Amino acid sequence: QLIAEQNGFISSPVHASISGTVKKIEEALTSQGTYVPAITIESDGLMTADENIVPPAVNSREDFISAVKNSGIVGLGGAGFPTYVKLDPKQNVDTLIINGAECEPYITSDSYTMISKAALISQFFELMKKYIGIKKIIIGIEKNKPDAIEVMEKLAESDPAVTVKTLPS
């Protein structure tokens, strides 16, 4: 469920990760020593999705970018950079680089996602090809993630646009 709206071009909406009740909105201290707005939600223990959430209708490049924008997808490299900005329709993008070598805590999540969600990743690649014009996909994975490498190499066997690059750990 949407809990915070985008307030500028280089920002994104925020969705609740749990179902429950908003208890407070206040400034919270981050591990970097700065204060940021934070929303505290008391979980109801049910993890139910808002019934108003429906998959977006995507029939064009603009629809696809809008769906990515409204979903709140951001990069995990520290800045939380909105993904939709990278898909700007004024730019001609033909290569997608997937960073499967992020630092902790995300490297474990990256590896798990590549192993357990290969079919969804493949669907995402097809959408990127169809709506953004991607021709080449490069997935970088650290060599100490052999299971993720194996699964992504199998995906690459069925998609000539995909290349897996093993990176030093």
PLM-predicted stretches and their roles:
Residues 2-3:
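Short hydrophobic beta-strand segments in globular cytosolic domains
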Residues 10-169:
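Iron-sulfur-associated redox domains of electron-transfer enzymes in respiratory
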